[in-house]
Amino acid sequence: MACKCDCKNKQCKCGDKCECSGDKCCEKYCCEEASEKKCCPAGCKGDCKCANCHCAEQKQCGDKTHQHQGTAAAH
């Protein structure tokens, strides 16, 4: 039960570890809900949400992504 990172804040208040998936997430976007445990990669524009993790006009984010382009390289 360490500190929690905010999705809107790319800088984690706690400079230790995130409850998401490693400190890497902390630096980028971490879900404030441990139940979701999801993180947005740096491929997002910056206004990504952890709950849905969907990018406005950028590459796939993670979970829900609008496949507007013809790229189907989803893990």
Swiss-Prot record:
**Does the keyword field hold Metal-binding?**
yes
Induction annotation: By cadmium.
* GO cellular component labels: cytoplasm
Keyword Metal-binding (UniProt): yes
| Keywords linked to the UniProt accession | Cadmium, Metal-binding, Metal-thiolate cluster
An example molecular function term from Gene Ontology annotations: zinc ion binding
Question: What's the domain of life for this entry?
Answer: Eukaryota
Gene Ontology BP terms? cellular response to metal ion; response to cadmium ion; response to heat; response to lead ion; response to mercury ion
Q: Which family does it belong to?
A: Belongs to the metallothionein superfamily. Type 6 family.
What does the record's free text say on domains? All cysteine residues are arranged in C-X-C groups. These are thought to be the metal-binding sites in other metallothioneins.
Free-text function comment from the UniProt entry:
This protein binds cations of several transition elements.
Protein name, please? Metallothionein-1
Q: What is the lineage of its organism?
A: Eukaryota, Metazoa, Ecdysozoa, Nematoda, Chromadorea
